[in-house]
Each structure stands twice: as C-alpha cells, then as structure tokens.
C-alpha cells in the first residue's frame, strides 16, 4: 500500500504532546513549529484521525518546493499528477498562508494554485476548460514559509477538537483537544480519580473518561477521507496500537 508523508497540526505549545502521542503509537517523528511529521499509509490516516487526542488535523504533504515568483508556483503545482488524487468532479477548495516570503499575498497565492490545478485537470481529463466541482470535497492547503511552499491535502475536515459527542455548547467551552492536552501533561492515566472543581461544560471530565475507558475520541464523527474516492472504505482501527 502506498506510503505518504503525513503530518499532524496542533495548537501552539502542544508539539511535544502530539509528538509523544504519535511515538506511543509506534511512529518515527520529526517535529517542526506547529507540525509533527510521520509516514504512513491509508490505515495510518484512519488510525491517527480516530485516536489522536491532542492534534488539530492530519494532512498529506503532496509536494514541497521553493517558490519566489508566481510562474514558479504555477509550474510546480501544474507538474503534480492531480488526476491521481482528484476525480474530475472533485470540489477542491484551496486555503493559503504565506509568511516571510516574496509571495506574500495570500489571495493571489490561492488563486494561482487553484488555476494551476484546474488547468492540469482540464488537460488530464480532456475537458474544455470546465470542471463541475459537484462531487466530494478534497480540502487543499498551500503554505509558504521563507519561500518554501508546501501543498497538502487535509484528511480530517473539521478540526479534531470537534469530537461529535457534544449536543449543545455552553459559553466559551474549552476545546476538547486542549483539554486532552492538559490531561496528557499531568500524571493522569485513567487509573485513579480525577477531580475538576471548575467543571464548566464538563470537557475535562469527558476527555478524562475517554482516556480511562480507552475510547477513541473520533468515534462519533466523520472525516474528509471518508469522501476520497481512492480511499479504502473498509479500513477501521479499534485500537491505537
């Protein structure tokens, strides 16, 4: 099965927590600011989305390259084999971010990337300049930092803190992955009682219970990869290891 360069994103300061989670699941990791890289196949995409408690998203790094002008950006994106990833009717919204780079206009970066992908797919699928975008969604992300561009596919969709178990929301509730991260920074492992004197909406207590019962935090939700037409729908992991 094909192996991908994957990475988890997380809130500021939680890199070491997510890194420890991934290593406990058996992955070799590399840490950057806001990202932890690891390799895996489709089963690992399912496993990490389902079981990681403290990450935000799991993305596939599709391509990395230097880009200091829009022509280079267009050509590098165009050169990728998009038909292998995107069906002809795919919706593919492009989110962009540019930091400390010559290409600093994020709307322009997004527009160029979108145009390059459309042009390539029109050529690959022998269309006449039109793509319907009526099918499933394949969220793409272009990030340029110090003139190094990375184009990625988001396998998660809504952030992993959206567990799916909360029916109603109180005022300013603590994010679920943040609560799990706080628990991971303590000795708590589910074998002894946890006292939360400021319960609020119960996020800490719920996340503690999930840890104690070894319940996957992604049990109640769907993910972007559920709609990828090349993704094996039979993959399911009931254990983080």
What positions do the PLM features span?
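Short, glycine/charged-enriched secondary-structure capping and boundary segments
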Residues: 108-110, 157, 209-213
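Conserved S-adenosyl-L-methionine
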Residues: 174-239
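S-adenosyl-L-methionine
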Residues: 8-14, 149-189, 218
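Structural beta-strand/beta-sheet cores of well-ordered domains, especially the beta-sheet scaffolds
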Residues: 4-6, 90, 136-140, 147-149, ...
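Non-catalytic nucleic-acid substrate-recognition regions in nucleic-acid-modifying enzymes
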Residues: 2-138
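Catalytic cores of enzyme domains
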Residues: 131-136, 143-163, 199
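Short capping/connector residues at structural and topological boundaries
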Residues: 65-67, 165, 170, 230-233
């Amino acid at each position: 099965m094909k192996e991908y360069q994957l990475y988890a994103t997380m809130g500021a300061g939680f890199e070491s927590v997510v890194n420890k989670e991934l290593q406990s699941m058996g992955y070799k990791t590399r840490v950057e600011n806001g990202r932890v890289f690891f390799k895996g196949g489709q089963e690992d995409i399912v496993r990490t989305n389902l079981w990681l408690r403290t990450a935000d998203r799991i993305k596939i790094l599709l391509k990395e390259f230097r880009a200091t002008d829009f022509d280079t950006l267009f050509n590098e994106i165009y050169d990728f084999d998009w038909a292998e990833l995107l069906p002809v009717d795919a919706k593919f919204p492009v989110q962009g971010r540019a930091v400390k780079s010559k290409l600093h206009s994020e709307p322009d970066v997004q527009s160029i990337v979108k145009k390059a992908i459309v042009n390539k797919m029109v050529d690959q699928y022998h269309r006449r300049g039109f793509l319907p975008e009526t099918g499933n969604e394949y969220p793409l992300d272009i990030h340029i930092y110090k003139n190094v561009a990375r184009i990625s596919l988001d396998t998660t969709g809504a952030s992993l803190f959206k567990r799916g178990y909360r029916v109603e929301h109180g005022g300013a509730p603590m994010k679920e992955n943040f609560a799990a991260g706080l628990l991971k920074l303590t000795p708590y492992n589910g074998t002894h009682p946890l006292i939360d004197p400021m319960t609020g909406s119960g996020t800490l207590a719920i996340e503690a219970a999930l840890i104690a019962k070894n319940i996957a935090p992604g049990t109640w939700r769907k993910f972007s990869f559920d709609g990828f037409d090349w993704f094996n729908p039979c993959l399911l992991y009931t254990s983080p290891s």
